[in-house]
Amino acid sequence: MYARGVKHTFTNEMMKQSVTNFMIANFDLKHGMMMSFKIHTAENQVVHIGIFPDKETADEYGNHTKQARQQIADMGAKSEILAGPLTDFLISGDVTLDQLTAKS
């Protein structure tokens, strides 16, 4: 498996929420993405991670999001791409699918 992520730093919280909602609606779990999650590291910052079966699928996904990423940059957000093989992916045996998919 392969992980592809972007750490976005926005100019404000409203921009963060708007872009995050847009990306969820238009790109999450599409174009070969198997799983997605977000890490909200600050009021105006989020790390969006997508999990793919392989690097080729992740790279193709990146091509689909290129225009949106450019528009996000044009609005003044700073973005850092994070990507690499996903290893040591462990899940406890007592974790349920409901726990993994619940919104907090």
What are these regions (language model features)?
Residues 1-49, 53-104:
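Short S/T/G/P-rich N-terminal loop/turn motif that feeds into the first structured element of a domain
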